[in-house]
A protein has these predicted regions:
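Nucleotide-activated chemistry modules centered on ATP-dependent adenylation/adenylyltransferase
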Residues: 2-275
Length: 275
């Protein structure tokens, strides 16, 4: 089984003929051919049933480094299991905001032990966190949406951008069922914000399908999921949901329900090239 580290990868399997995606420089808009190639990969992934086979197709189609960001929630644990099972050459990293539940950190350790992986841990800049807390207070993110978004930006978005530097593909564990904003999410799209291909190999999975996969493969799962936490983020910003509530109702519960995102997955993505 290959060891996932923060170091660059060796040579990848040869891509399918005519199916290679070519990353564009980060400072330029996505040319029309890159958008078209991402759409073609999206169609190929939709025709594949197995998660493991989808991951292999991703590594065949996307040249250069492919990386997977895990929040250590149940969706990401399923993808992590499939990466290990398939031997797909995909780096793995997670964001430690400094405010995780202890159970989340326990899941990180259990996952590394189970799969023999070295999961790269990305931290926010300490000085930026100090300045944020000095300005807004330790719980200032509850006073205004702008404060909360600033906190997410420093603790999550900026470390994410550092982790994605130099990557050609970014794998996530997002599912369409998770929120209205993700209902039409593709398997693959050109990510204009980061200059790479964004890949969602379990986009079409139902919760029942996800839970069945996890049970069948004895995947390590964050115990908070069994305590009413379908979506798990930072401890001060996450609560258990009540019966009948949306699965993301426990995230930033003091805010309006519309468009509650941390900024990791709601930036501009696939765009048409300028005429």
């Amino acid at each position: 089984m290959p060891t996932k580290t923060s170091a660059g990868r060796g040579a990848k399997a040869a891509p399918s003929a005519g199916a290679t995606l070519r990353p564009a420089p980060l400072s330029r808009p996505a040319p029309a051919d890159l958008v078209a190639e991402a759409l073609a990969l999206d169609r190929r992934l939709a025709a594949i049933d197995s998660l493991e086979d989808r991951l292999v197709e991703i590594t065949r189609s996307v040249p250069g480094r492919v990386t997977f960001s895990t929040s250590l929630g149940i969706e990401d644990q399923a993808v992590l299991n499939a990466i290990a099972a398939s031997g797909a050459q995909i780096d793995v990293f997670t964001l430690d905001t400094g405010r995780h539940f202890p159970e989340t950190l326990d899941t990180l350790e259990a996952s590394e032990n189970r799969y023999g992986l070295n999961i790269r841990v990305m931290f926010p800049d300490a000085r930026e966190v100090e300045e944020l807390v000095a300005r807004d207070g330790i719980y200032g993110f509850r006073l205004a949406v702008e404060n909360r978004k600033a906190c997410c930006d420093i603790r999550k978005v900026r470390p994410l951008k550092r982790a994605l530097q130099g990557a050609a593909g970014w794998v996530t564990g997002l599912r369409r069922e998770q929120s209205a904003g993700r209902a039409h999410m593709p398997f693959a799209s050109w990510d204009a914000a980061d200059g790479l291909v964004k890949l969602n190999p379990i986009a079409d999975w139902s919760l029942e399908q996800l839970e069945a996969y996890v049970a069948a493969n004895n995947v390590p799962v964050n115990p908070l999921h069994a305590r009413g936490f379908p979506s798990i983020g930072c401890q001060p910003c996450t609560r258990a949901i009540k019966p009948g509530e949306d699965i993301r109702a426990g995230r930033w519960w003091w805010e309006n329900e519309d468009g509650k995102e941390c900024g990791l997955h709601n930036r501009p993505r696939q765009k048409e090239a300028a005429a």
